[in-house]
């Protein structure tokens, strides 16, 4: 078979596999959407987990069915904001399990359905590493007037950011070309997606936020309590994120995003999570705090204690970068002097 034909067949098979993975995701979402007539929004679900924690609500995680509706938040279409003044009431407490009674549900309309379709479409383009244009979105996805496009794009962008950890950025405003950028400064060997192409960065940022707001070290049971409110259960396969325990204690640990260690002198043994070296390298406390602030529709500075700690971390990172550059410059200068000395001796 000619080489060109083989290349076309491989490309076609790659597209088929990508479509298959996302079609499986869409099928799973459709099933859960049928179970919940009015699923909560992407922002509302995460906001309720974090916001209720910050407000100090009583510990009372709801059952599996309600948590399942929470887990569909990546494709739910409603967009909500907290009532006025709610941020003024926030207290800085560690993120832990809290009830989700504030979760709102909304009727689904044509615009909401378009948001869901656009999220699917953008995830597909991200997996295929294909450019995203406004013209393609209008023609192939939204199929509606340009006046509705900004609202649909804004909501889809929020879901992608809060759940999948992807930022939608316009790279060529004149041509309306967009790209999806991972919130982490991923290395070349990063594997924060599975065979469906669903990025797990949003979930990782959530875990890093739990660790950060619990004094940079959190007991495993506290992470599971938050996971349960998000519809993630130990030993139960999740249609987007796989088996949570494997992801949390093996995959993310193997990738060096998390450290999983036994609590000293604990009997029976208990375990805790810390940031791994890769998390420190690819994100920062400030970026994680910005993520939490985005979830709660507020500014990072509203969380004064954590903001102060994040600022100190930024300053330390800046000093480390300056010191590293100085070392590189000094090394380069020393090598230049050695070469110059050898050259003069030869002459």
From Swiss-Prot:
<feature type="compositionally biased region" description="Basic residues">
    <location>
        <begin position="1"/>
        <end position="18"/>
    </location>
</feature>
<feature type="region of interest" description="Disordered">
    <location>
        <begin position="328"/>
        <end position="347"/>
    </location>
</feature>
<protein>
    <recommendedName>
        <fullName>Melanoma-associated antigen B10</fullName>
    </recommendedName>
</protein>
<dbReference type="GO" id="GO:0005634">
    <property type="term" value="C:nucleus"/>
</dbReference>
<feature type="domain" description="MAGE">
    <location>
        <begin position="111"/>
        <end position="310"/>
    </location>
</feature>
<dbReference type="InterPro" id="IPR041899">
    <property type="entry name" value="MAGE_WH2"/>
</dbReference>
<feature type="compositionally biased region" description="Low complexity">
    <location>
        <begin position="67"/>
        <end position="78"/>
    </location>
</feature>
<dbReference type="InterPro" id="IPR021072">
    <property type="entry name" value="MAGE_N"/>
</dbReference>
<dbReference type="Pfam" id="PF01454">
    <property type="entry name" value="MAGE"/>
</dbReference>
<dbReference type="GO" id="GO:0000122">
    <property type="term" value="P:negative regulation of transcription by RNA polymerase II"/>
</dbReference>
<dbReference type="Pfam" id="PF12440">
    <property type="entry name" value="MAGE_N"/>
</dbReference>
<feature type="region of interest" description="Disordered">
    <location>
        <begin position="1"/>
        <end position="20"/>
    </location>
</feature>
<dbReference type="InterPro" id="IPR041898">
    <property type="entry name" value="MAGE_WH1"/>
</dbReference>
<dbReference type="InterPro" id="IPR002190">
    <property type="entry name" value="MHD_dom"/>
</dbReference>
<feature type="compositionally biased region" description="Basic and acidic residues">
    <location>
        <begin position="81"/>
        <end position="92"/>
    </location>
</feature>
<keyword id="KW-0825">Tumor antigen</keyword>
<feature type="region of interest" description="Disordered">
    <location>
        <begin position="56"/>
        <end position="92"/>
    </location>
</feature>
<dbReference type="InterPro" id="IPR037445">
    <property type="entry name" value="MAGE"/>
</dbReference>
């Amino acid at each position: 078979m000619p080489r060109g034909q083989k290349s076309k067949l491989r490309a076609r098979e790659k597209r088929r596999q990508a479509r298959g993975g996302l079609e499986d995701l869409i099928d799973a979402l459709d099933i859960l959407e049928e179970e919940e007539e009015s699923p909560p929004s992407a922002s509302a679900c995460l906001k309720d987990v974090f916001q209720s924690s910050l407000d100090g609500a009583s510990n009372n995680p709801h059952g599996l069915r309600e948590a399942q509706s929470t887990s569909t938040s990546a494709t739910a279409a409603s967009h909500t904001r907290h009532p006025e003044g709610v941020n003024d009431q926030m207290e800085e407490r560690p993120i832990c399990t809290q009830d989700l009674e504030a979760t709102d549900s909304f009727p689904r309309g044509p615009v909401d359905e378009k948001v869901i379709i656009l999220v699917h479409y953008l995830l597909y383009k991200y997996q295929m590493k294909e450019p995203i244009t406004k013209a393609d979105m209008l023609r192939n996805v939204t199929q509606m007037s340009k006046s509705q496009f900004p609202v649909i794009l804004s909501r889809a962008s929020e879901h992608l950011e809060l759940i999948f950890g992807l930022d939608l950025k316009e790279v060529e405003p004149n041509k309306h070309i967009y790209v999806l950028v991972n919130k982490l400064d991923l290395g070349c060997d990063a594997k924060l997606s599975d065979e469906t192409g669903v990025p797990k960065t949003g979930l990782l940022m959530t875990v890093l936020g739990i660790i950060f707001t619990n004094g940079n070290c959190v007991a495993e049971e506290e992470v599971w309590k938050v996971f349960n409110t998000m519809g993630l259960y130990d030993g139960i396969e999740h249609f987007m994120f796989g088996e949570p325990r494997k992801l949390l204690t093996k995959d993310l640990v193997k990738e060096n995003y998390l450290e999983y260690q036994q609590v000293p002198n604990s009997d029976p043994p208990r375990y805790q999570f810390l940031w791994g070296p890769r998390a420190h390298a690819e994100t920062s406390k400030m970026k994680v705090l910005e993520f939490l602030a985005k979830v709660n529709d507020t500014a990072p500075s509203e969380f004064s204690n954590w903001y102060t700690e994040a600022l100190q971390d930024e300053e330390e990172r800046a000093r480390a970068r300056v010191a590293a550059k100085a070392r590189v410059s000094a090394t380069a200068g020393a090598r230049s002097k050695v070469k110059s000395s050898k050259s003069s001796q030869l002459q």
